[in-house]
């Protein structure tokens, strides 16, 4: 299985990768990282992703714009998406869900919570 992690903070990308690899050992996972929404869009045609994790606040294409694009694209709309963000209001969660995100995780989070939500996401795939 292949996961795309879209996060502009290199330290958060490294943390997400470490947590995912440590908590999903029973899955044969490959993690691909993108530092921006634009980089994610350039990466998509070269891989078949089983799930995408994206931050919201990024410098070029934000995570919600990315979710909207993916869920409206015939090739990518079936890929499950988890939004991971410091944006914690119910309105933010509803907006992400309305755009098609299957999961929403607020930073900071417990590693186990990320792993649990990712396992749910991968079952959807």
Regions found by a protein language model. Give the residues of each.
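C-terminal output helix
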Residues: 109-118
């Amino acid at each position: 299985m292949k996961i795309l992690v879209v996060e502009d903070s290199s330290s958060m990308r490294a943390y997400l990768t470490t947590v995912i690899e440590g908590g999903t050992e029973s899955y044969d996972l490959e993690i691909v990282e993108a530092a921006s929404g634009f980089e994610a869009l350039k990466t998509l045609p070269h891989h078949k992703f089983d799930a995408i994790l994206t931050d919201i606040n990024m410098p070029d294409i934000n995570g919600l714009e990315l979710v909207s694009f993916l869920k409206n694209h015939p090739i990518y709309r079936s890929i499950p998406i988890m939004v991971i963000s410091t944006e914690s209001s119910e309105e933010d969660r509803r907006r992400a869900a309305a755009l098609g995100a299957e999961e929403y995780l607020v930073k900071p989070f417990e590693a186990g919570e990320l792993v649990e939500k990712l396992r749910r996401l991968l079952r959807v795939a």
